[in-house]
Amino acid sequence: MFSSLRLAISFLTIFPFYNKMADNKELAQSVSYYPLVGFLLGSIAAGVCYAMHSIGLNLAADVLGLVTIITLTGGLHQDGLMDTADGIFSGRELHRKLEIMKDSRVGAMGVIALATVLLLKIAFLFELDLAQKLTAFIMAPMAGRWAMVLAITRYPYARATGGLGACLKQAGKTQLALATLILVAGCLWLFGLPGLALLGIVFFITWLTVEFIVKRLGGMTGDTYGALGEMIETWVIFLILLGQQIRML
């Protein structure tokens, strides 16, 4: 377990906790712990946000919390979001979309997608009470990384030749089940039983989002895993805000 967790942390963050070359089987087993990595990242971000709030900062605290996660992950998922947007919204045929996504240059749609996601996250976080804000910082990365596990284990890989994401395709139902258990436990700890309603909506939105991507690309890639995570994080923060406004969470 701890070996797989260290590998998951090393794979998804800038922390080199796994000091040897992992094979595909080890990478696949580590997928189970992606939501736990999200919990750790979110806890650090929540701590930064709380510290900034304690000295009187509000909007800056929200932004610094988000910047903390981006920094700790090396901007990996934001890069995937931009590449995915450039490819999907290019209006080209399938093979050209995949080529565009591999291009290191960023297009207009990628910039627009990243700006939109960041602005939405900041706006939603700013409207939250401090307690809900801190739970959102923890819950959103957990759910985003669970969504990646769902896509990895249940949907085909889009490219004919393997990329970084293809190394994870040995992951299956066992990894998804454990990742789901971690997510459910975390949600119940943060929200109690009302959190189950939140999870149900998150599961449905995740399914819709993955289906949207697969329909346009023929499968998933490493970039789309990151894009999916970013989109689900944004949805989770919004849903927590909605739950606050209707006094459900």
From Swiss-Prot:
Source superkingdom: Bacteria
Parts of the chain that traverse the membrane: 36-56, 57-77, 106-126, 133-153, 188-208, 226-246
Pathway linked to the protein: Cofactor biosynthesis; adenosylcobalamin biosynthesis; adenosylcobalamin from cob(II)yrinate a,c-diamide: step 7/7
UniProt cofactor(s): Mg(2+)
Listed EC numbers: 2.7.8.26
GO cellular component, as recorded: plasma membrane
Keywords: Cell membrane, Cobalamin biosynthesis, Magnesium, Membrane, Transferase, Transmembrane, Transmembrane helix
Catalyzed chemical reaction(s): alpha-ribazole + adenosylcob(III)inamide-GDP = adenosylcob(III)alamin + GMP + H(+); alpha-ribazole 5'-phosphate + adenosylcob(III)inamide-GDP = adenosylcob(III)alamin 5'-phosphate + GMP + H(+)
GO molecular function: adenosylcobinamide-GDP ribazoletransferase activity; cobalamin 5'-phosphate synthase activity
Subcellular location: Cell membrane
A Pfam family the protein falls into: CobS
Enzyme type, top EC level: transferase
Its membrane topology: Multi-pass membrane protein
UniProt keyword Disulfide bond present: no
GO biological process: cobalamin biosynthetic process
Keyword Transferase: yes
Job description of the protein: Joins adenosylcobinamide-GDP and alpha-ribazole to generate adenosylcobalamin (Ado-cobalamin). Also synthesizes adenosylcobalamin 5'-phosphate from adenosylcobinamide-GDP and alpha-ribazole 5'-phosphate.
NCBIfam families: cobS (TIGR00317)
Family: Belongs to the CobS family.
Name the record gives this protein: Adenosylcobinamide-GDP ribazoletransferase
